[in-house]
């Protein structure tokens, strides 16, 4: 006879979870001193704790309401005639020609690199676009998606998704990881589920996890964060607490960035006490993880427009709300190119920090360093797509960061860690030579980025923007079966990040066995 059922346990925990207000820190119980133990012999209470969590998320996966899992009804009306084209570049000025033509026709540029430009447009606009392009570009494009509406529909969670659909296109090693992984990461999750999950993590792992908020969005939503570490268990600290900040979801449609933040948070949380490397890194640093800094836009991308990019703040043009959060920071802000066009996907606002969410994150970071006894030594801003690791500066290639050599060394180390984990290749370059700069050359501002602000204004020694999977086959509509593999490779990169920033004292930390696999829940 079973003493507990998953439903009974879940119902017992619901008051506990609901009692934790979103955006507030959770007071931990008396300090716990973690011990190291093996995967095969977990502590009894840890085993029960993990079983409870696994049971809860099994229930959520099977009984998730249609409100969260059903795609918006207007997908085919909005995107039924849209396609995504990739233009292959042969000459440097071709990217500028494409961007200029896209601005004239109000098209959505998905990606600009030194090799290609991806553009979304209605199929009946293709002749108009080609007429504005040089002859060399008129025959140098290929379709990436010829039925965008169906691709968008497929990106939403489905309660009837078959195992064969889920497993298509993945290597056997990746499938093995997914089969052992928490079901929470087998689908993209709406904000309401993510917030409840964060509260549960803080409640169940209170020795080293707290839930907090970095501010409130324009529409009044909390911007929740998880703070991982053991500093709250220490009565005295010597100097500011070293902190690593990881942010996702600046652009609402980049769902993989939000899911990756939750995956690496869960990996750090559950490896604590099991892995000596993770345990030491959580003793040395506070890790602050924000799944989405743009909750309003993220919710809107679930409920109304899957490809929404900006926040939901009103602008001077009522029909074109939203400011690009990654163009709104007050270091080398350059919003003149988009000031007169609030409809632009890159609209930077009428002045620096007009985007409320960017302002809130900056205020939180400044308060942490000025009053909270913290030193933000690392900043990782996760985006998609194109598989790039970018370091400062983004606003200009004529300005060289004073710590360029260290920035390059660590960036190459992150790329190597990813390659060793999944065999995926991430390009390493200055942001001014990557996607951001190509956009700037084409008249799209690249100033006002979070990457540059943290590095220059807050003196964060290691500041990066990481463009996650893939290289364009799916673009912003990366299938959910890539959540786990992407999370694994970024988790390994984060451990490499923490070890490098720590320096010589961490030279004895071994990451060889850190594959990014989840600690089993049963």
From Swiss-Prot:
- Leader sequence range is 1-19
Peptidase M14 domain location is 187-501
Cofactor section: Zn(2+)
Which cysteines in this chain are paired by disulphide bridges? 320-343
What protein name does the entry list? Inactive metallocarboxypeptidase ecm14
Cofactor descriptive note: Binds 1 zinc ion per subunit.
Tell me where it resides: Vacuole; Secreted
Q: What is its main location?
A: other
| Organism this protein belongs to | Penicillium rubens (strain ATCC 28089 / DSM 1075 / NRRL 1951 / Wisconsin 54-1255) (Penicillium chrysogenum)
Q: What residues bear carbohydrate chains? A: 367
Cell wall biogenesis/degradation recorded as keyword = yes
Sequence positions that bind Zn(2+): 251, 254, 383
Q: Pfam families per the record?
A: Peptidase_M14
Record-listed substrate binding positions: 251-254, 309, 326-327, 384-385
This molecule's function is given as:
Inactive carboxypeptidase that may play a role in cell wall organization and biogenesis.
Q: Determine the domain of life of the protein's source.
A: Eukaryota
Instruction: Keywords in alphabetical order, please.
Output: Cell wall biogenesis/degradation, Disulfide bond, Glycoprotein, Metal-binding, Secreted, Signal, Vacuole, Zinc
